[in-house]
Structures are given as structure tokens and as C-alpha cells.
Amino acid sequence: MVLTHNVLAVTFGVLGNIISFIVFLAPVPTFVRICKKKSIEGFESLPYVSALFSAMLWIYYALQKDGAGFLLITINAVGCFIETIYIILFITYANKKARISTLKVLGLLNFLGFAAIILVCELLTKGSNREKVLGGICVGFSVCVFAAPLSIMRVVIRTKSVEFMPFSLSLFLTISAITWLFYGLAIKDFYVALPNILGAFLGAVQMILYVIFKYYKTPLVVDETEKPKTVSDHSINMVKLSSTPASGDLTVQPQTNPDVSHPIKTHGGDLEDQMDKKMPN
């Protein structure tokens, strides 16, 4: 029975490494597009900064497990390297506002935040207690990472556009979450299994939204000048639904000009009457 658990743990751990590696590479088409256009368009840096911080946390957590966390260390070390490249590319092609915003989040979260966690854990906790504290922090932040696409999902629902929610990323995130869920169950690690339940669920919801809106029949027109450019400018401004005809016809109807034959009114009556009164007999 113990051997079976070990085999399952190694199997799911290796599969988790392979699938997670594919997940880390999923945004490559996005960054190829960014590099070609030399613009971040509507894409954001927050998912990549968050993913980097999450990988750093899991490495620190795995180091507390005395060799049992080797498979967690390997994939998250690779993740740190890949996410760092993404962030560098994002900063390179971002406008000034997005660049400053990204650097602020990176400094506060990945440097000051991570340093604070290490200091607290090293100075105030020991042994199994440190593992529990770190595990709780990892679970909490992983839930936040998995919940981050909720804002993207809101934009997809509002705009009926899946342009900024790549299907490949949603698919592999779902598969990865399921794999790590089973890995956590196999090694009986509550902290690894729990957040991946939420990850699998949200990933499935994203794929459903993609299928629904990929072939949406009445796409809305995006104003190129109003596309989000920074992390804070997340909403994609579209033509309001209330101004779109129910039939889906987006043809702009010309406004009817006022009837020039109608006399112009003034406080004293018709303009024509006023002029007549002022004309000499």
C-alpha cells in the first residue's frame, strides 16, 4: 500500500512537472505578439508577477519538507526563470504608466513581501510549525492567483470577446490543477491539494466562457483608443449594449436634421413675427 502511494505520488508529480512546464510556456504566443507589435495592448503583467511570487513561495515551502518536496522545487525553479523573462519583456514594451505600475507591484510583492515572509518564518517559527505557517501562506496566495482571472472573466462576459483570455492557457491551467490535486492527495499534503480544487473549477469555467463567446454572433466594436493599457485600466470599453440595435445590425443610422421650414421660436414668439414687428412700414 505504501509502495502504491509512492508510485502514485511520483507519477502525478512528474506529470505535474510536465504539464506545469507547458502552462509556463502557454503565454509564449502572447509575448510573440507583444514583441511583434512592440505594444502590450490589453494584456497585463499582474498574472506573471503573481505567478513568479507563487513559485518563489512554493520553493521556500518545499525546502521545509526535507527532500519530500523535490518535485515541487524543480518545476517552480523553472517557473521562476520563465516568469522573469515574461516580466522583462512586458516592462520592455509597456508604456510608462504600465511600466511604473508593474515595477511597483514587483517591488512590493516579490521583494519586500517575500523578504517579510522569510523573516517572520525564520525568526518566529520552527520545525513543523514553520511548515504549517508557510503552507497556509501558500494556500492563501494560490487561491488569490487562481481567483485573479475572475476579472478577465468579467471582461469577457461584458464585452463578449475572448481576445485577452487565451484558451490554451485556460486548458492547461485546468489540467495542471487537476494533476497537482491528485499529487497532493497522493502525498497527503493538504496545502498542495486544497488550492488546486479551486484552480480546476475556475479553469473549467474559463473554458466554458471561451466556448460560449468564441462564436458569439453579435461581436461588439472595440474603440482602439480605449483598450486597456495598464494593470489598473483593466476594463475594455466597448460600444454600450443599449446603443446597439436588438437585431444585431451595427449600421450607424444618420440623425434627422430639424425641419428648417419650422419657424425658430423665441421668448416673444416666432422669429418671423419678431422681424415683421421691427420692419418699418
Swiss-Prot record:
Residues 244-281 are annotated as: Disordered. Keywords: Cell membrane, Membrane, Repeat, Sugar transport, Transmembrane, Transmembrane helix, Transport. Residues 28-42, 92-104, 154-166, 214-281 are cytoplasmic. Residues 1-6, 64-70, 126-132, 188-192 are extracellular. The keyword Repeat applies. It is found in: Cell membrane. One of its GO terms (biological process) is gibberellic acid transmembrane transport. Residues 267-281 have a biased composition (Basic and acidic residues). GO terms for cellular component: plasma membrane. InterPro entries: SWEET, SWEET_rpt. Residues 11-97, 133-216 form the MtN3/slv domain. It is a multi-pass membrane protein. GO terms for molecular function: gibberellin transmembrane transporter activity; sucrose transmembrane transporter activity; sugar transmembrane transporter activity. Residues 244-259 have a biased composition (Polar residues). The chain crosses the membrane at residues 7-27, 43-63, 71-91, 105-125, 133-153, 167-187, 193-213. Its main location: membrane. Belongs to the SWEET sugar transporter family. Mediates both low-affinity uptake and efflux of sugar across the plasma membrane. Forms homooligomers and/or heterooligomers. This is Bidirectional sugar transporter SWEET14. It comes from Arabidopsis thaliana (Mouse-ear cress). The gene is SWEET14.
